[in-house]
Amino acid sequence: MSFDIAKYPTLALVDSTQELRLLPKESLPKLCDELRRYLLDSVSRSSGHFASGLGTVELTVALHYVYNTPFDQLIWDVGHQAYPHKILTGRRDKIGTIRQKGGLHPFPWRGESEYDVLSVGHSSTSISAGIGIAVAAEKEGKNRRTVCVIGDGAITAGMAFEAMNHAGDIRPDMLVVLNDNEMSISENVGALNNHLAQLLSGKLYSSLREGGKKVFSGVPPIKELLKRTEEHIKGMVVPGTLFEELGFNYIGPVDGHDVLGLITTLKNMRDLKGPQFLHIMTKKGRGYEPAEKDPITFHAVPKFDPSSGCLPKSSGGLPSYSKIFGDWLCETAAKDNKLMAITPAMREGSGMVEFSRKFPDRYFDVAIAEQHAVTFAAGLAIGGYKPIVAIYSTFLQRAYDQVLHDVAIQKLPVLFAIDRAGIVGADGQTHQGAFDLSYLRCIPEMVIMTPSDENECRQMLYTGYHYNDGPSAVRYPRGNAVGVELTPLEKLPIGKGTVKRRGEKLAILNFGTLMPEAAKVAESLNATLVDMRFVKPLDETLILEMAASHEALVTVEENAIMGGAGSGVNEVLMAHRKPVPVLNIGLPDFFIPQGTQEEMRAELGLDAAGMEAKIKAWLA
């Protein structure tokens, strides 16, 4: 994908941050305009995260202009907002490949650029890492500076506050920038507040502030008066008391789209000692009206025509598994007022929009707080309700102790609806749902189900919802269902699989939605095909029957082979001293990079052709 860089004459001068810092300051507003247009041009042609980057253009330019990156270390939280950062740090001509197989990584990635200090993808990690990096820089003694950029959503997570509490204790020299795009620029973000921010961040004020503390430290009444006077002045326009109490010097809020004002404030703050906190207000989707009006829809986009202002509509074909879940949720809630649904900031992605509108008093979005979500569900279960935690596989990892300690040990009936299980595609290593079967299978009392199609998914959700002897989990993939008929809901027998096809020497034991591919292989090789359904408890009787009547077994799953469902089958056979050969097909022992689901399954041998080739090579 090529771009006519002549349309962006100022941006064309910037292939690195060193070149950026050679530009006269007066040219930076023009650079910001061109950078925003370039981002629109590139993402609309290739797809990617969009609205967040539009909102951080001025901040990105200002940070790289003021700080000596990559010597100074700039850390982005999550990374959705880092496309302008990639464009300014030598990757401008490759931005059209982002999120594609072999292209730029969707998030800041250490292996991609020296400018990407921390590999990210999950939220709220930046401040913790930043403290460690700042402490290391202090010990290095080369005056290397550390900056963390975190959004208003990510900063609500407990990990961010744990980190800030620690920073207030050990007081490293670092800057945390809060990119607050929750609302349009407030009344406080005007000339007075910007002037106050520059005044309070200036060297004169800081020197007087610290000097006064030392002089009057032995005179408590005067020291307390100075503290209260400062708080009163700042409190007239500053909502930063919480961050001050955590030990940060708080500045803001300031206009995050005033690049020259940001540069002045950042220059003032750059040499201040101790933990600093700059609160900026931005508009998500800034500069592209459709994204400003609907930043959720334009958060991540497919290819689209920017002149139309509309994203392409889906073809209206098969429903996604997320929609299957959402429809089941509404159907069940209408019949049972004990149902409570919980999501950690994934309402749209998890298919819960309709439920949140129909049953607002039974819908809980706990924000980016996976640990809290799970233990909150435990409390609801103790109170006699039926909680369902709708969560992506990759994010459930963040609440593992809560699943084990707060739910499973107490045998509480919490249902986990695990979306995005298996290969997710363009978001790459940080978002693949590769490990949930492995990390859940070892938990006592856990029931784990792997549907092979949307009808089975509904039946399993129903089964898990009515299972009262402990927690249960249903895992299903990103993407569309297969188009089978939906039958009336009924409970499945726990721990029982079903034979889908009878063959001869080989039996394929399938776990989950790779069933269509497994069926093609079974037909080609005249193999028996089993829908195992349950990863825990396993259908040991059926496994032993297959071992006794076949010369070899193959297990198929879209989870890490290590510790996954296939490993469970191996354990059953060894426990019963059955010397039947077993081939485990699943995700290999490395972090799977980005690419479409189809591309990655083909590369990993998880499509029908790949599975058949693996089996034939193994049998040869």
From Swiss-Prot:
Listed under catalytic activity are: D-glyceraldehyde 3-phosphate + pyruvate + H(+) = 1-deoxy-D-xylulose 5-phosphate + CO2
Keyword annotations from UniProtKB, A to Z: Isoprene biosynthesis, Magnesium, Metal-binding, Thiamine biosynthesis, Thiamine pyrophosphate, Transferase
Q: Name one GO cellular component term.
A: cytosol
tRNA-binding keyword on record: no
Tell me one Pfam family matched here: Transket_pyr
Describe which pathway this protein belongs to, using the record's wording: Metabolic intermediate biosynthesis; 1-deoxy-D-xylulose 5-phosphate biosynthesis; 1-deoxy-D-xylulose 5-phosphate from D-glyceraldehyde 3-phosphate and pyruvate: step 1/1
Gene3D superfamilies, per this entry? 3.40.50.920, 3.40.50.970
Stated EC number for the protein is 2.2.1.7
- Sequence positions that bind Mg(2+): 152, 181
Q: Name one GO molecular function term.
A: thiamine pyrophosphate binding
Q: What is this protein called?
A: 1-deoxy-D-xylulose-5-phosphate synthase
Protein species of origin: Shigella dysenteriae serotype 1 (strain Sd197)
Q: What is the lineage of its organism?
A: Bacteria, Pseudomonadati, Pseudomonadota, Gammaproteobacteria, Enterobacterales
Gene symbol of the encoding locus = dxs
